[in-house]
UniProtKB/Swiss-Prot annotation:
One of its GO terms (molecular function) is proton-transporting ATP synthase activity, rotational mechanism. This is ATP synthase subunit delta. Belongs to the ATPase delta chain family. It holds the Pfam family OSCP. It is a peripheral membrane protein. The gene is atpH. NCBIfam families: ATP_synt_delta.
Amino acid sequence: MNKDNLIQNYAVALFNNALLDNIQVKICEEITLLNSIIEDSFEIKKFLFSPLVNKIDKINVFNSLVKTTNFNKIVNNFLLLLIKNSRTHILSNIVEVYNKLLYESRNIKIVHVISTNELQPKEQEWIQSRIEKELQHKTELFFDIDNTIIGGIVIKYDNVLRDYSIKGSLEKIAKCLKNVKIC
């Protein structure tokens, strides 16, 4: 089984378990928080991801941590399963797929907007309203910064890329100029 299928299977299984108790959003918040804790702590990440650390030691440490947290039993069991199967390294990918499943179930499109600098709240709202009007769909926007686009914005959703950047425009002009033949 390839990595993408494995990630998809774990995310779908977690989502379906959350769906049974109608706690999809709560589980999403908890696994996102858990993933942030792991990603932000070098020591925890090193411990969980290291093949040199015995699985039993990882499980024992995890079980002692569970007693001090208020995470849902589904989240605790899920992370325990990842530890037992040596799959903790794909947790961030699982969180990403889980989020997509959650948005799809709520009929919300995920849209990534890339700009050269941080957009003001009014600009973000304007972009969101324009995109929602065009797609006739509710959206959840994620804003990223990329200085290489020089100016403008790039919008990504589903398999669609809308490039309104200066870099994209220059690349289009360059492509057209390559096709021009001088007599």
